[in-house]
UniProtKB/Swiss-Prot annotation:
Gene behind this protein: Smtnl1
Family of the protein in this entry: Belongs to the smoothelin family.
Induction line: Significantly reduced by exercise in smooth and in skeletal muscles.
Protein name: Smoothelin-like protein 1
Basic and acidic residues bias spans: 42-55, 75-105, 112-168, 185-211, 221-232, 287-300
Keyword line: Calmodulin-binding, Coiled coil, Cytoplasm, Muscle protein, Nucleus, Phosphoprotein
Record organism: Mus musculus
Subcellular location, record wording: Cytoplasm, Myofibril, Sarcomere, I band; Cytoplasm, Myofibril, Sarcomere, M line; Nucleus
Amino acid composition bias (Polar residues), ranges on this chain: 1-27
Oligomeric and partner information: Interacts with PPP1R12A.
Tissue specificity of this protein: Widely expressed, with highest expression in skeletal muscles (at protein level). Within striated muscles, significantly more expressed in soleus muscle compared with plantaris muscle or white vastus (at protein level). 30-40% lower expression in females than in males (at protein level). Expressed in type 2a fibers, but not detected in fast twitch type 2b muscle white vastus nor in oxidative type I/b heart muscle (at protein level). Expressed within myometrial cells of the uterus, as well as in the endometrial layer. In the aorta, confined to smooth muscle cells.
Length: 459
């Protein structure tokens, strides 16, 4: 009983000191039973058995007729025991949760390790994939190269096929060159006794040769000319391939189309040509005779060129504009002299107009443009030769149309002067055109000369 009052039980539950103050023997028995129950059942029974035991003890105490204070104490004990049981349950739940958490962490750690182990072989797989890709690319490149090589080989074979034909053509040309060289040797042997005759032909030609008489190249050049002439006779050349050259520089032409004299002092090695070039020479026999025929044609055609088209044009112009009365303009062949003469004639005609209209009013002739704008100058010039045609004093400078009409109509009727100027044009222009006025005055002068009203030095 002493242990239950102030000390704690083995399972950690404390007994309140009120249990020791209980005066009733029933209550003391209940306390003892409770203590014994706590000691005996703490190790074996769980919280549920403990609660049932307490309920039984309470019921017994109730049946024994204990006091209400004891009932309250029992209720408190029940609640304490239930709270402890709940705390134990919670502690066990916490322990179970901790265990579950530990198991989860271990499982997670195992999974992490598994993942690490799984991730470790990934670089190897990537490497294998890359190697496979590289191998496939290399195979493709090799296939392309082999295809290109095969194509190139096929092209080379195709190109190499016509080569035998070319070789055959080259052999044919070599054979032709050999035969031509043999023919040339025969021609040279035949040409040696004929050299004097050829020299006689060349000396008889009219062409001039600028070669020194004692130079050693002269004989070689003469021999080459002879050979070229004889080769032209032996080897025919088509006129389409070798047209005649229009140049007249020497008696014969070399294979290059130049005369041997034009080369000057050339060495024998430089002047000699290959056998393939010699047969194609466009030389023809006796070219000096053709040149003789051509030379007179040029001499005859030179003086037959037409001369003096300008003189004919001048005559036509002077006949049209009445320049015959003006004098020696057609005699000038130099353009500068002709221009000076025309300027002199123009000035002379201007001075003549001034002299004819000197005493007339409203007339001051200084040129062939503005001085004739009012029409009074035309009227004064015509009134000078035909004073009975109209009264000059009645004319008004402001009436331009009347003045032009009177002057042109009177000149046409009395002097047979063509009306080269239009009245409307003269009225429309404030300053008349000098060329038009000069042409009309020139025509009027010619008409007056034909009428005998103006005397010239020639007549």
């Amino acid at each position: 009983m002493e242990q239950t009052e102030g000390n704690s039980s083995e399972d950690g539950t404390t007994v309140s000191p009120t249990a020791g103050n209980l005066e009733t023997p029933g209550s003391q028995g209940i306390a003892e039973e409770v203590a014994e129950g706590t000691v005996g059942t703490s190790d074996k029974e769980g919280p549920s058995d403990w609660a049932e035991h307490l309920c039984k003890a309470a019921s017994k105490s109730g049946e024994s007729g204990g006091s209400p204070g004891e009932a309250s104490i029992l209720d408190e004990l029940k609640t304490d025991l239930q709270g402890e049981a709940r705390g134990k349950d919670e502690a066990q739940g916490d322990l179970a949760e901790e265990k579950v958490g530990k198991e989860d962490t271990t499982a997670a750690s195992q999974e992490d390790t598994g993942k690490k182990e799984e991730t470790k072989p990934e670089p190897n797989e990537v490497r294998e994939k890359e190697e496979a890709m590289l191998a496939s690319e290399k195979q493709k490149v090799d296939e392309k190269e082999t295809n290109l090589e095969s194509k190139e080989k096929s092209d080379v074979n195709d190109k190499a096929k016509p080569e035998p034909k070319e070789d055959a053509g080259a052999e044919v040309t070599v054979n032709e060159a050999e035969t031509e060289s043999q023919e040339e040797a025969d021609v040279k042997d035949q040409a040696k006794p004929e050299l004097p005759e050829v020299d006689g032909k060349e000396t008889g030609s009219d062409t001039k040769e600028l070669v020194e008489p004692e130079s050693p190249t002269e004989e070689q050049e003469q021999g080459k000319e002879n050979e070229s002439e004889e080769r032209a006779a032996v080897i025919p050349s088509s006129p389409e391939e070798w047209p005649e050259s229009p140049t007249d520089e020497g008696p014969s032409l070399s294979p290059d189309g130049l005369a041997p004299e034009s080369t000057g002092e050339t060495s024998p090695s430089a002047s000699e040509s290959s056998p393939s070039e010699v047969p194609g020479s466009p030389t023809e026999p006796q070219p000096s005779e053709k040149k003789k025929d051509r030379a007179p044609e040029r001499r005859v055609s030179a003086p037959s060129r037409p001369r003096g088209p300008r003189a004919q044009n001048r005559k036509a112009i002077m006949d049209k504009f009445g320049g015959a009365a003006s004098g020696p303009t057609a005699l000038f062949r130099n353009t500068k002299a002709a221009g000076a003469a025309i300027g002199g004639v123009k000035n002379m005609l201007l001075e003549w107009c001034r002299a004819m209209t000197r005493n007339y009013e409203h007339v001051d002739i200084q040129n062939f443009s503005s001085s004739w704008s009012s029409g009074m100058a035309f009227c004064a010039l015509i009134h000078k030769f035909f004073p009975e045609a109209f009264d000059y004093a009645e004319l008004d400078p402001a009436k331009r149309r009347h003045n032009f009409t009177l002057a042109f109509s009177t000149a046409e009727k009395l002097a047979d002067c063509a009306q080269l100027l239009e009245v409307d044009d003269m009225v429309r222009l404030a300053v008349p055109d000098s060329k038009c006025v000069y042409t009309y005055i020139q025509e009027l002068y010619r008409s007056l000369v034909q009428k005998g009203l103006v005397k010239t030095k020639k007549k």
